């Protein structure tokens, strides 16, 4: 159960996942169900709510898929990784239960121009290869990657922003002696009509594991 205090929701989540070899790569599948409950002091839906009104006793299907494929071209090792995340709602949802697109964690290339909806998906694709950078005798393994993401959301309520986003990323990451950093540039490629298009963004993330 998940209690969301700002909306007073109680949610039952049932999730399943499967990972298996498929061809030369690894395929992952997931399927889940979320149900808003009346338990634990949750908000109760009143009778006769219009279709556009969000429900506390909602229902939605969650799904996902991923594929990891290593391959070799021109004497160099490459990997292709694709992941799909989505949901299909049976009712209008509160914001905490909607799916959102437009961030470094969903469709890259967007910061201010994100979209949220009752139903939707996002697909992230990365192509990467590795090389070694060795200044002053220190060896740093570098992962170079290019990404192309897309996603779309829909809302049951009329007049709420919805549509599709497409974005791209180009970057490099290093892991060395517990430290990790990632430098990337993300750019928006497509937005819904009427939505302001953002410029490219450069991101730097640094971490350390003890």
Report each predicted region and the residues it spans.
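A generic structural micro-feature
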Residues: 6, 138-140, 162-164, 196-198
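Outer-membrane beta-barrel translocator/channel fold
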Residues: 1, 187-202
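A short alpha/beta connector and helix-capping loop motif
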Residues: 159-172
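Outer-membrane beta-barrel "beta-signal"
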Residues: 172-176, 198-210
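C-terminal outer-membrane beta-barrel translocator/porin domains of Gram-negative envelope proteins
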Residues: 1-150, 154, 204-206
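C-terminal beta-signal and adjacent terminal beta-strands/loops
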Residues: 148-159, 178, 184-193, 210
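Short basic/hydrophobic patches in alpha-helices and adjacent helix-turn junctions
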Residues: 127-130, 171-175
């Amino acid at each position: 159960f998940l209690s969301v205090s700002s909306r007073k929701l109680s949610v039952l989540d049932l999730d399943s996942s499967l990972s298996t070899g498929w061809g030369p790569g690894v395929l992952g599948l997931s399927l889940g169900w979320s149900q808003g409950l009346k338990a634990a002091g949750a908000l109760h839906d009143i009778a006769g709510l219009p279709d556009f009104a969000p429900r506390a006793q909602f229902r939605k299907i969650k799904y996902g898929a991923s594929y990891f494929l290593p391959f070799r071209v021109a004497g160099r090792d490459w990997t292709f990784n694709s992941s799909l995340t989505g949901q299909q709602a049976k009712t209008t949802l509160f914001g905490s239960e909607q799916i959102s697109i437009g961030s470094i964690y969903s469709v890259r290339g967007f910061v201010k121009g994100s979209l949220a909806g009752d139903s939707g998906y996002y697909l992230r694709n990365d192509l990467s290869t590795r090389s070694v950078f060795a200044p002053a005798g220190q060896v740093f393994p570098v992962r170079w990657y290019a990404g192309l993401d897309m996603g779309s959301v829909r809302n049951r309520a009329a007049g709420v922003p919805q549509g599709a986003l497409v974005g791209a990323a180009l970057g490099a990451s290093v892991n060395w002696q517990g430290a990790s950093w990632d430098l990337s540039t993300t750019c928006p490629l497509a937005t819904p009509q009427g939505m302001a298009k953002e410029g490219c963004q450069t991101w730097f993330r640094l971490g350390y594991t003890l």
